[in-house]
Amino acid sequence: MFLWLVIVLTISASVSSYEHKLNWVVPPANSSESFNDWASNKRFQVGDIIQFKYKKDSVMQVTKESYKQCNSSHPRFYSNTGKTRFMFDHSVPYYFISGTSGHCEKGQKMIVEVISRDHTTTSAAPPAAFAVLLCFFSLSLYFVA
């Protein structure tokens, strides 16, 4: 039973997707933070979802060149629903800009680096390690009781 629990917890920790939530607004003029700062502090994997929340705005996925130029004329993806969910389906950089005139130039743009699910890094270890620790603790309680 212990081994089965370890396997189930490890598998569930490694294959589940995550939903990242973001308030998609024009950054304040005096802000030193950017959406790229936010994105670089997150770990995005294939299958993860990003939820953009905004009012009277839009979000576009664009090419690298369109991102650099804040060009919204040919988006790969466009939404203006106020609550947009976007799923990452490839391990590539994704480029997002606001489709509202002038917003991208004011910093409402972001690059998201997405890695594959089988990509291993040191930050992937804690969920599995936590599952093993939890199972060990549970097993210890079983033998003590």
UniProtKB/Swiss-Prot annotation:
Entry-listed glycosylation sites: N30, N71
Membrane topology: Lipid-anchor; GPI-anchor
Main location: membrane
Tissue expr: Mostly expressed in leaves and flowers, and, to a lower extent, in roots and stems, but barely in seedlings and seeds.
Subcellular location: Cell membrane
Swiss-Prot/TrEMBL keywords: Cell membrane, Disulfide bond, Glycoprotein, GPI-anchor, Lipoprotein, Membrane, Signal
GPI-anchor amidated serine: lipidated positions: S116
Domain of life: Eukaryota
Signal sequence coordinates: 1-17
Domain Phytocyanin: 18-116
Cysteine pairings via disulfide bonds: C70-C104
Pfam families: Cu_bind_like
GO annotation, cellular component aspect: plasma membrane; side of membrane
Pro-peptide region(s): 117-145
GO molecular function: electron transfer activity
Family assignment from sequence similarity: Belongs to the early nodulin-like (ENODL) family.
Function of the molecule: May act as a carbohydrate transporter.
Name the UniProt record assigns to this protein: Early nodulin-like protein 21
UniProt organism field: Arabidopsis thaliana (Mouse-ear cress)
Gene: ENODL21
